[in-house]
Amino acid sequence: MSIGILGTKLGMTQIFDQESGISIPVTVVQAGPCPVTQVKTQDTDGYNAIQVGFLPVKEKALSKPELGHLKKSNTDPMRHLKEYRLTDAPNLQPGDAVTADIFQAGDLVDVAGQSMGRGFAGYQKRHNFRRGNMTHGSKNHRLPGSTGAGTTPGRVYPGKRMAGQYGASQVTVRRLTVVRVDAERNLLIIKGALPGKPGTLLNITPAKTVGRG
């Protein structure tokens, strides 16, 4: 894994392609700055990695072990910590900052975050089931239909798609394009929609090659 960055989703807007004039939906992300809170090497920990922090908070918001850990790197109290494994020994030191300029326009990234929670949702909203007839005497409008056979197997199979909690789960959107980088304000402009609502914590990493194209 390469070095990534933590950020928060600010919202969506659109920009226009200068050549074709086509509007491009984009999401604005406040990416970093993320101070390096720990450096791990093959000699000391058995693998190479760096740990970064994000979102400064007051000391009273953290426990004493967390404060002691951050004090070793002389960094301010941070709400979130994230570790990124590296193939080679890191060239960063505790206290250095990871900023948005680690990415460039045109880079492909994977973005992970918690999706918006939709509460207890039914079959149509959660699984895109077709509804029944609304007229002609039908009383089956939004019912699930059959959930299994009779005496055999005499039970509902595990994994049967039914109503339940929808959303509020960890989601990764892969191979999104970085359209623009604002290094001064640590902003990433990423093409497309990202998980969660404004304020959601996002983990942005260089894209892993999955499939073709």
Curated annotation (Swiss-Prot):
Region (Disordered): 135-155
Ribonucleoprotein in keyword set: yes
MF (Gene Ontology): rRNA binding; structural constituent of ribosome
Gene Ontology biological-process entries: translation
Gene Ontology cellular component annotations, sorted alphabetically: cytosolic large ribosomal subunit
InterPro entries, A to Z: Ribosomal_uL3, Ribosomal_uL3_bac/org-type, Ribosomal_uL3_CS, Transl_B-barrel_sf
Keyword list, A-Z: Ribonucleoprotein, Ribosomal protein, RNA-binding, rRNA-binding
Family: Belongs to the universal ribosomal protein uL3 family.
Quaternary structure and interacting proteins, as annotated: Part of the 50S ribosomal subunit. Forms a cluster with proteins L14 and L19.
Function: One of the primary rRNA binding proteins, it binds directly near the 3'-end of the 23S rRNA, where it nucleates assembly of the 50S subunit.
Stated name of the protein: Large ribosomal subunit protein uL3
Species for this entry: Synechocystis sp. (strain ATCC 27184 / PCC 6803 / Kazusa)
Gene: rplC
